[in-house]
Every structure is written in C-alpha cells, then in structure tokens.
Amino acid sequence: MSYAQNNLGWMYRNGNGVAQDYTLAFFWYKQAALQGHSYAQDNLADLYKDGEGVAQNKTLAAFWYLKSAQQGNRHAQFQIAWDYNAGEGVDQDYKQAMYWYLKAAAQESVGAYVNIGYMYKHGQGVEKDYQAAFEWFTKAAECNDATAWYNLAIMYHYGEGRPVDLRQALDLYRKVQSSGTRDVSQEIRETEALL
C-alpha cells in the first residue's frame, strides 16, 4: 500500500498522468511515510524543505530525512548530512554531518565525496587533513564532478598538502570552465600569468 501511495505522491508532484498538485503530493507522501516507506519519507522531507504543498518547515524536513536515512536512503543520508553541516532544521553538528556523508559515500554519492573532502580540508568534524581531502576530491573528480575539479585545482594552485603544480591547476581550471558550472576565467588568467 505504501508503495502505491508514494507513487501517487510522485505523480502529483511531477504532474505525471495527473494535474500537478503539491497538496495532493504531500498528502500521499505523508500516508506512505507514516507507514515507514523510506522513499516517501525522503520525498516528504523535500516538500517540507521547499515549502511545496505545505508550509516550509526545515525542522520537519530534517526529521523525515533522518527517518529515511536511517533506513539506508542515500539521498536522505546526503540531505541530513547537509542539514547537520549547515545547521538547517537541526543544531549544527559537524561530526553528525561527517557520519551521514560517509554513509552516503558508501553508496557512491558523488556529492558526499566532495563534501567529505571539503570537511577534511577545513577540519570540520575531523582533524584537518589535506591528503584525505585530496583523496575524496579525486574520487569525485573521477566521476566528472566539476566542484571536485575546482577544489583539486585550488589544492594544486596553492600547494595545499602537495607541491604547487600550476600546470595541473590550470588543466583543472579549464575543465571547470568547459563544464559551464562556474566561471573560473579569473583563476585561469592568474594561473597562466604565473607560468
């Protein structure tokens, strides 16, 4: 029953086969979520986070992400980690953020790879460790993640945990620029001027 209810929620949220209706999406997701359906819990959390079909409530979003994450839902694990990292809907707790990012990373969440790298780079919830940051960014970069390329470029550019390598930094900046995800033309010009 909860599977069908979650599917109805999805159909109403996305306007698939029915008129889009966030209020009905919320209703059906909640029915399934209350029965323990992890995807419905995750979807319900998204609606609370975005204020779709219900008043925005980041505390309830975090509550439902956590419920879903505890059942192994990768997206929910990433989202509750994000919430703990940002203090959104829950008290900020870097250790809990790292715990849930690692859970999501174990299920190949590329976003989690990047954020774990960031936390190691900045010593959030863990000891600052440039080598660990580099390894996590590299793992994400191997999945063609432009944010990871950017972070690796910075590490090569400024010699964070490794010798300065401006050529490698420049190559990575160019990959980021080509991806269209962010404008790094200034970084490219500055690096070219140093070569």
Model-derived features with residue positions:
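TPR/TPR-like alpha-solenoid signature
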Residues: N6, F27, D42, F63, ...
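Intrinsically disordered, low-complexity repeat regions of secreted/extracellular protein precursors
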Residues: D21, W28-Q31, N43, N57, ...
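Hydrophobic face of amphipathic alpha-helices that form TPR/SEL1-like repeat modules
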Residues: N7-N14, N43-D50, Q79-A86, V90, ...
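Short helix-capping/linker turns of helical repeat alpha-solenoids
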Residues: M1-S2, N14-N16, D21, L34-H37, ...
